[in-house]
């Protein structure tokens, strides 16, 4: 006789990956429960990561825009806002997102259970509830979408009131005048922009030789120059020897012999998967040193009835990709295989001030691959719309094949870059000869718009051909 389970599938985590999986499963008629350890749905993306940091960035960006606008230059005082005030704006956005996502589950009759899950055996979970009770749940299949958390090295005292990670920084109650940021990855660079935009001194400690080395080098160099021009002090190829907290701040001793002191430290150097409390050993699964699971193309782990999506499987660690991974895993879970697959060229959005966004290959990759490419560029300062709204800092770069005119990569630096990139991405994804830079020359754009940058860049690139 077939075994009777409480659910067809249990999803652990309600972030983008868990939500994508849960919605995909219930739409296919499965009985689904979602387990969330926090009191509200949404996961780290909604409560500690993407949403609050982007809401903070938006508020700071508007303050900068106001202070730099010549319309208000006669005002004797600059517009300023405290970190607490800006956090209130982020809280408002978080609440809206939480209510909306809670509605998704309610409308689709998907059960939400609060507590910490751990595996008892291959088809059984123990749920440690907030009231101290323990429930036992069974399911035929599982989706692990429990996300990640900031990496905490053992020699850094994160209990000190002036030492923060990218989660706890959202609970900061004092107004720093000087911030140390250790780790110049995406999170470190975004918070460097936010704090510098609030006129806080920033020291950005980079353990590598350049910022965001995965980007096209021109984009990385543009960010470095913009940071330098705004007063951010970047220290490349540095690692800490010791971090000590004191009453009025934090002192960082670097292996190079330097010492730095600031009002507080944001440690933003890596993340680790939230798998340590799942008792994965009870179902024969192992994680790597960063708590991440290995999966196949259908997001199955070494146990075929257990799937994993999102940050817990590592690259690309993007909310957008996690949702799609969940949706694909749901299809594979129900039908045995997935016809959908994650797209090859996933766009990257980095919400510094200004933004950076990329899709496709970089110049360095194409040069290494010996692909005959050409470059088309458009400077924002030459666009009427950019001049109107005062967004003169920025550039759009299109890389295309010299012979076939196929678009190979698009890179954008400037305000709204993460929006602008999708116009080019849509053309890059076209099949049957539809991917060509000539599209931007032969179509008509609204005027004045930022989208016009594509026509300008296309003409610039095609004019280089001979």
Curated annotation (Swiss-Prot):
Record's keyword annotation contains NADP: yes
HAMAP family listed in its UniProt record: SthA
Compartment(s) where it occurs, according to its Swiss-Prot or TrEMBL record: Cytoplasm
Cofactor remark from the record: Binds 1 FAD per subunit.
Domain of life: Bacteria
Family to which this protein belongs: Belongs to the class-I pyridine nucleotide-disulfide oxidoreductase family.
GO molecular function, one term: flavin adenine dinucleotide binding
Reaction(s) catalysed (UniProt annotation): NAD(+) + NADPH = NADH + NADP(+)
Alphabetic keyword roster: Cytoplasm, FAD, Flavoprotein, NAD, NADP, Oxidoreductase
Amino acids binding FAD: 36-45
Keyword 4Fe-4S assigned: no
Protein name per the record: Soluble pyridine nucleotide transhydrogenase
Reported cofactor(s): FAD
Organism this protein belongs to: Escherichia coli O6:K15:H31 (strain 536 / UPEC)
InterPro entries in the record: Class-I_Pyr_Nuc-Dis_Oxidored (IPR050151), FAD/NAD-bd_sf (IPR036188), FAD/NAD-binding_dom (IPR023753), FAD/NAD-linked_Rdtase_dimer_sf (IPR016156), Pyr_nuc-diS_OxRdtase (IPR001100), Pyr_nucl-diS_OxRdtase_dimer (IPR004099), STH_gammaproteobact (IPR022962)
One GO CC term, this protein: cytosol
Chief place where the protein resides: cytoplasm
Role according to the record: Conversion of NADPH, generated by peripheral catabolic pathways, to NADH, which can enter the respiratory chain for energy generation.
EC nos: 1.6.1.1
Record-linked Pfam families: Pyr_redox_2, Pyr_redox_dim
GO BP field: 2-oxoglutarate metabolic process; NADP metabolic process
């Amino acid at each position: 006789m077939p075994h009777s389970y409480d659910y067809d599938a249990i999803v652990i985590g309600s972030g983008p990956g868990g939500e994508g999986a849960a919605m995909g499963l219930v739409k296919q008629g499965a009985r689904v429960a979602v387990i969330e350890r926090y009191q509200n749905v949404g996961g780290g993306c909604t409560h500690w990561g993407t949403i609050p940091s982007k809401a903070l960035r938006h508020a700071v960006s508007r303050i900068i825009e106001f202070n730099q606008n010549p319309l208000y230059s006669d005002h004797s005082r600059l517009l300023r806002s405290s970190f607490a005030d800006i956090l209130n704006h982020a809280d408002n956005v978080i609440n809206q997102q939480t209510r909306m996502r809670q509605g998704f589950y309610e409308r689709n009759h998907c059960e939400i259970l609060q507590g910490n899950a751990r595996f008892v055996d291959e088809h059984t979970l123990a749920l440690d509830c907030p009231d101290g009770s323990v429930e036992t749940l069974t399911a035929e299949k599982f989706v692990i979408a429990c996300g990640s958390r900031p990496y905490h090295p053992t020699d850094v005292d994160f209990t000190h009131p002036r030492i923060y990670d990218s989660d706890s920084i959202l609970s900061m109650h004092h107004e720093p005048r000087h911030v140390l940021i250790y780790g110049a990855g995406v999170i470190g660079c975004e918070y460097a922009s936010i704090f510098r935009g609030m006129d806080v001194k920033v020291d950005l400690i980079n353990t590598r030789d350049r910022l965001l080395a995965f980007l096209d080098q021109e984009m990385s160099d543009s960010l470095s120059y913009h940071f330098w021009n705004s007063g951010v002090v970047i220290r490349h190829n540095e690692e800490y020897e010791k971090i000590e907290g004191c009453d009025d701040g934090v002192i960082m001793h670097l292996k190079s012999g330097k010492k730095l002191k600031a009002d507080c430290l944001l440690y933003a150097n890596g993340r680790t998967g939230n798998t340590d409390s799942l008792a994965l050993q009870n179902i024969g699964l192992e994680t790597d040193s960063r708590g991440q699971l290995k999966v196949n193309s259908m997001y199955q782990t070494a146990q075929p009835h257990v799937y994993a999506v999102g940050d817990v499987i590592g690259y690309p660690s993007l909310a957008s990709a996690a949702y799609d991974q969940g949706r694909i895993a749901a299809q594979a879970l129900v039908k045995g295989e997935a016809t959908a697959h994650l797209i090859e060229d996933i766009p990257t959005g980095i919400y510094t001030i200004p933004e950076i966004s990329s899709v496709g290959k970089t110049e360095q990759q194409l040069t290494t691959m010996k692909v005959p490419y050409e470059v088309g560029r458009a400077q924002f300062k030459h666009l009427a719309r950019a001049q109107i709204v005062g967004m003169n800092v920025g550039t759009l770069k299109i890389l295309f094949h010299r012979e076939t005119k196929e678009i190979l990569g698009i890179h954008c630096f400037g305000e709204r870059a993460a929006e602008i990139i999708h116009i080019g991405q849509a053309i890059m994804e076209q099949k049957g000869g539809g991917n060509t830079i000539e599209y931007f020359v032969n179509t008509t754009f609204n005027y004045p718009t930022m989208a016009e940058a594509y026509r300008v860049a296309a003409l610039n690139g095609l004019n280089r051909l001979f």
